[in-house]
From Swiss-Prot:
GO BP annotations, alphabetical order: translation
Protein name per Swiss-Prot or TrEMBL: Small ribosomal subunit protein bS20
Keyword entries, A-Z: Ribonucleoprotein, Ribosomal protein, RNA-binding, rRNA-binding
Source organism, top-level taxon: Bacteria
Gene Ontology CC, one term: cytosol
Organism: Borrelia hermsii (strain HS1 / DAH)
Length: 85
């Protein structure tokens, strides 16, 4: 780690951003698992409503560059394929 003020500030910012990104990624994993479980249980209407919520969260994370936009698209595609079966 650097010793000048700007390097110290960057280190603080990186730590704060890392904590926020880890939190968002964890939330994404949790809601994806919940959507998968709704699909597996056969609750199509609930799963469809929840898919819209998951889709919105994935797009937001991609827009903020927490995850790559292609990853968000892939996750949404896989969930929608499972939902339509």
């Amino acid at each position: 780690m650097g010793n000048n003020p700007s390097a110290l500030k960057r280190a603080r910012q990186n730590l704060k951003r890392n904590l926020r990104n880890v939190s968002v990624k964890s939330e994404l994993k949790t809601i994806e698992k919940r959507c998968m479980s709704l699909i597996r249980e056969g609750k199509k209407e609930e799963a469809l409503e929840f898919f819209k919520f998951v889709s919105k969260k994935l797009d937001t994370a991609a827009r903020k560059r927490i995850i790559h936009r292609n990853k968000a698209a892939r996750k949404k595609s896989n969930l929608s394929i499972l939902l339509l079966r």
